[in-house]
Design a protein with these regions (language model features):
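Gram-negative bacterial Sec-dependent N-terminal signal peptides
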Residues: 1-20
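Extracytoplasmic/secreted envelope proteins and their assembly/folding machinery
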Residues: 21, 32, 49-53, 66, ...
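Short, well-ordered beta-strand elements
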Residues: 22-33, 71, 81-85, 104-108, ...
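N-terminal lobe/hinge region of extracytoplasmic solute-binding protein
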Residues: 27-78, 109, 186-188
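Short, solvent-exposed loop/turn elements at domain surfaces
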Residues: 33-38, 64-66, 94, 146-149, ...
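Aromatic- and charge-enriched surface segment that lines or borders ligand/interaction sites
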Residues: 72-117, 131, 137
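Surface-exposed binding/hinge segments that line
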Residues: 86, 120-170
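Gly/Pro-rich hinge or "lid" segments in bacterial periplasmic/extracellular proteins
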Residues: 155-215
């Protein structure tokens, strides 16, 4: 829900037309703790991450769960412990890399690692596996109909980008760690990082290749 509220305010004001850019300034009581999408599980950090990263699912303005990077999802009839997700095709990360099932498997496993405060949301997950390039199965220890509620803040990272920048493991904020993802991003979201000064200012720009640009208003006249 936070994502859509912010998109309706921020994205609406980011571009007035193709020839005339507008800027919106968004003041908050507290800054994001980190840009690493799997390090912290708290409101201000998620609110900023939602602008640059997407989850498999999201919430609409009423709070209902709707499609995001996954277009279909259901527990398998033959095994209710397994959730199957059909992924959105044609999505790219901000650097142009294609999004596929390998990124989902990587991201969910990364969020389960020691030091990630997101791991509690995936505590019942015992396996995540790619069925094909755009299908992922997530198996839980028992039938878990509430699991999809935990996926709206579970952001998808580019596996290749993470490996290239040595951020396969999430930042452990409690231990005082920092990593490349602390100050840099590469998501599939509506906005791209331009610059960041912690506790002062974070500057974003519209993602011209955003997969959802035809679903949400991005121009104002």
């Amino acid at each position: 829900m936070l994502r859509l509220i912010l998109l309706s305010a921020a994205a609406l004001s980011v571009t007035a037309s193709a020839a005339s850019a507008e800027t919106i300034r968004w003041a908050r009581a507290g800054d994001s703790i980190t840009l690493d999408p799997h390090a912290q599980n708290e409101g201000p950090t998620h609110a900023l991450a939602h602008q640059m990263y997407d989850g498999l699912l999201q919430r609409d303005m009423s709070g209902a769960i709707i499609a995001s990077l996954a277009t279909e999802w259901a527990a398998l009839a033959e095994n209710p412990n397994v959730w199957r997700f059909k992924l959105r095709e044609g999505v790219t990360f901000h650097d142009g890399a294609a999004f596929d099932s390998e990124d989902v498997v990587f991201s969910l496993n990364r969020a389960k690692q020691e030091g990630s405060e997101m791991q509690e949301l995936l505590a019942s997950v015992v396996d995540v596996r790619a069925v094909d390039a755009y299908t992922v199965d997530m198996e839980t220890a028992g039938a878990n109909p509430l699991m999809i509620n935990n996926l709206t803040n579970m952001f998808m990272m580019d596996k290749g980008w993470a490996e290239a920048n040595d951020v396969v493991m999430p930042q452990n904020v409690t231990a005082g760690e920092t990593n490349y993802a602390t100050m840099n991003t590469n998501g599939t979201g509506a906005f791209m990082l331009v610059s960041r000064s912690v506790d002062e200012k974070t500057v974003l720009k519209a993602n011209p290749n955003y997969w959802g640009k035809d679903l949400y208003p991005t121009e104002v006249s």
